[in-house]
Swiss-Prot record:
GO terms for molecular function: ATP binding; protein serine kinase activity; protein serine/threonine kinase activity. The gene is CIPK4. This is CBL-interacting serine/threonine-protein kinase 4. It comes from Arabidopsis thaliana. CIPK serine-threonine protein kinases interact with CBL proteins. Binding of a CBL protein to the regulatory NAF domain of CIPK protein lead to the activation of the kinase in a calcium-dependent manner. The modification Phosphoserine is found at residue 167. Residues 302-326 form the NAF domain. Its cofactor is Mn(2+). Keywords: ATP-binding, Kinase, Manganese, Nucleotide-binding, Phosphoprotein, Serine/threonine-protein kinase, Transferase. The activation loop within the kinase domain is the target of phosphorylation/activation by upstream protein kinases. The PPI motif mediates the interaction with the ABI (abscisic acid-insensitive) phosphatases.
Length: 426
């Protein structure tokens, strides 16, 4: 069977890793890891593989950072603007993190080449970053190191948030819900983080987004000084100036994001509601379905698959952890109906209650979620024309004996929905 992935000009050396990937050129390296492009032997797909020296991570105390990165990416891997994690493998001396290959490289490189971006291009990247971070925050994850060097581009030029090594997961918060670890890159770091007091990770990320948008439009960071103490003073005093070419709406957003007081600082969700942000917005209404599904499933069927330090750091033999990402069985179908979107949502909720599911409705986006045990169903409705709607139905079961359960729940849904369905598709 011919591979669905087109042949790439990437040079692959022929070195085979654990019988699964052919290694190619080195993309980058650090003190304890190096990254190579590689090709999957089974599919032909290009991926990036981060090869981590286990002993060096132990010696430098970096293993918690690796665990955070893997666990955050695992939880967020369905958002189109978060770099996807495919699998984790390990040997006695190495950890192999296999992720999506971002052929466009770092956004930082593009900024160096062009100096600054026009407002339309800057807005597109900012929209994608805000969408990804909003998704992270709804799952209780703060990135804490947002900067162009950690934002990659795929071959279509879409932004991919990467490097979750400094991220904070929900379980890292103290009893008052705040974070206390000072981290990040100084020029992008919020003043409350610098002050080393408890802080809200989402608000700290919002500050970094303000710096990011300024950098895209101006071509330089708003707070810059060779003396780090002087730079921190500027950050606390909001001491910066806008170049003349930045528009008033963009200035307003940046100013509100760069509010030294986190209590009054604009949130990322508030930014997403502004006219400036929504101009030329390319995100499809259908895109949210996968995000809603995974968030709903995470709440309904808490998985015990969290990757532990023992799993990765203390391994004494080869191990393929790809199963962590293959435990869910999905089935989906689309139908049209000559009723209102509200009627479809109402009907789906009634079906859920009848079949013994817990029902959650997200009215503003016409999404209804049904949960029972380790099964989640999501129905998302979009009005296609007056009196005609299109609905996506997804059933997911997480666990070992999932095939029969998926078919069982699927059959029940089909029968109950027939009353309103005009026609089924795919």
């Amino acid at each position: 069977m011919e591979s669905p992935y087109p042949k790439s000009p990437e040079k692959i050396t022929g070195t085979v890793l654990l019988g699964k990937y052919e290694l190619g050129r080195r993309l980058g390296s650090g003190s304890f890891a190096k990254v190579h492009v590689a090709r999957s032997i089974s599919t032909g797909e290009l991926v990036a593989i981060k090869i981590i020296d286990k002993q060096k991570t132990i010696d430098s105390g970096m293993e918690p950072r690796i665990i955070r990165e893997i666990e955050a990416m695992r939880r967020l891997h369905n958002h189109p603007n978060v770099l996807k994690i495919h699998e984790v493998m390990a040997t006695k001396s190495k950890i192999y993190l296999v992720v999506e290959y971002a052929a466009g490289g770092e956004l930082f490189t593009k900024l160096i080449r062009f100096g600054r971006l026009n407002e339309s291009a800057a807005r597109r990247y900012f929209q994608q970053l805000a969408s990804a971070l909003s998704f992270c925050h709804r799952d209780g994850i703060a990135h804490r190191d947002v900067k162009p060097q950690n934002l990659l581009l795929d071959k279509q030029g879409n932004l991919k948030v990467s490097d979750f090594g400094l991220s904070a997961l929900p379980e890292h918060r103290s009893n008052n819900g705040l974070l206390h670890t000072a981290c990040g890159t100084p020029a992008y770091t919020a003043p409350e983080v610098i002050a080393q007091r408890g802080y809200d990770g989402a608000k700290a990320d919002a500050w970094s987004c303000g710096v990011f948008l300024f950098v895209l439009l101006a071509g330089y960071v708003p707070f810059d000084d060779a003396n780090i103490v002087a730079m921190y003073r500027k950050i606390h005093k909001r001491d910066y100036r806008f170049p003349s070419w930045i528009s008033k709406p963009a200035r307003s957003i940046i100013y509100k994001l760069l509010d030294p007081n986190p209590e009054t600082r604009m949130s990322i969700e508030a930014v997403m509601g502004t006219v400036w942000f929504q101009k030329s917005l390319e995100i499809s209404e259908f895109q949210s379905s996968v995000f809603e599904l995974d968030r709903f499933l995470e709440k309904e069927a808490k998985s015990s698959n969290a990757i532990t330090a023992f799993d990765l750091i203390s391994l004494s033999s080869g191990l393929d952890l790809s199963g962590l990402f293959e435990r869910r069985k999905r089935k989906e179908k689309r139908f049209t109906a000559r009723v209102s979107a509200e009627r479809v949502v109402e009907k789906a909720g009634m079906i859920g209650e009848k079949l013994g599911f817990r029902v959650e409705k997200k009215e503003e986006t016409k999404v209804v979620g049904l949960g029972k045990g380790r099964t989640a169903v999501v129905v998302e409705v979009v009005e296609f024309a007056e009196g005609l709607v299109v609905a996506d139905v997804k059933v997911v079961v997480e666990g070992e004996e999932e095939e029969e359960e998926v078919e069982s729940h699927w059959s029940e849904l089909i029968v109950e929905l027939e009353e309103i369905v005009l026609s089924w598709h795919n």
